Structure formats: structure tokens, C-alpha cells
Amino acid sequence: MAYNTPLTSTTEFGSMKVGTGFTSTNGTVSATLGLLNYGFFTSSIPQTNPVANAVNLSTFNLTGPANGISIVGGTAITVVNAGTYTKLFTIIAAKTSGGTSVISIWLRLNGVDVVGSRQDLDLINTLSLIFTSGNFTLDIPAGGNIQLCWSSADITVVLDALPAAVTPTRPTGNSVKVTLTRIS
């Protein structure tokens, strides 16, 4: 296919204007992809509940794939760019006491509890492990951070990590996992 007039050039506008994100070389237009921010953060260690009914901030000691999002101070998942983000978390909860205990899990944005983000989980009797996950979508300002908080009145409640196992060989399981992805 041939054109009498180029689509665009660096000196003249054709059918389109070269601007941010677009380049033109000999009539060929190229656009860069806008890579959104993302991050995967996890903890390979158990996290205890040393004080009943106190706020525990989930800590992270491992970073997976990430772009524009990082961990600050071990607990704050911090974004470079403002935007709408979706957060997905998974925890492994356990307890060693009898009866029913409640673990509350919620989100903080820049140190302030996020309304509507709490979920409660009943841990019944002495149970080995229970997995739970949740998600939340929110606007985060540039330089802002989120934290995954949890609490329980029962000090035997922990976020537990699984060791590697054999017969058959199985990998470790981390106590907390969070994926944060910018969606706009």
C-alpha cells in the first residue's frame, strides 16, 4: 500500500500529530506501551499475635516481580504513581487454643484504616491451617502506601508459613502474599 502523503513526519503533520508516546520514522508510526505498575510481595516467616486485640502490620521479606511499587520499612507497600489499584491478598491462619477465635483483616491507606475493607474469619477449635484471601480496589496517591493489618483477641492465632515437604516433594507456603496492580 502506498500513500501520496506520509502519515506524519518529524517536521510536518500528516494524518496524525507526533507527540508523547508516538514516534515516526520514514512514515512508520510507533507507539510505546504504557506499562502499568504492579508488585508481588510475600513473607516466608510466621507472624505472631503477641498482644491480644492489638493491630499487627503484616511484614514482607520477599519481593517478586514489581514495577513502580516497593516495600518500605518492611510493612508499607508504596507506589510511585497515583492511580486506581486493585489489591489481592492471601494468608495462612492457624491457632493452637480451643474454642472459637476471630481474626480481623483490613487495609490501611497512608496510615488510615480503609472503611469497608475489613473481613473477619472465625477460627474454630484447634485447627491446623486455614487459607483465606480477599481483594479491594482503591485510589492511591503518588508516593502513597497500603498496609495489610490484622488482629485477634487470641494470642495463639498466627499467620503461618509452611515448610518445604517431601513424599511427594512440595514447595514452601508463605504466611502472607499480596499482589498490588494499577488498573488505571
Please give the residue ranges for each predicted region.
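Extracellular jelly-roll beta-sandwich "head" domains, especially the C-terminal globular C1q domain
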Residues: 32-184
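Surface-exposed, low-helix, low-complexity loop/repeat segments of extracellular attachment proteins
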Residues: 1-33
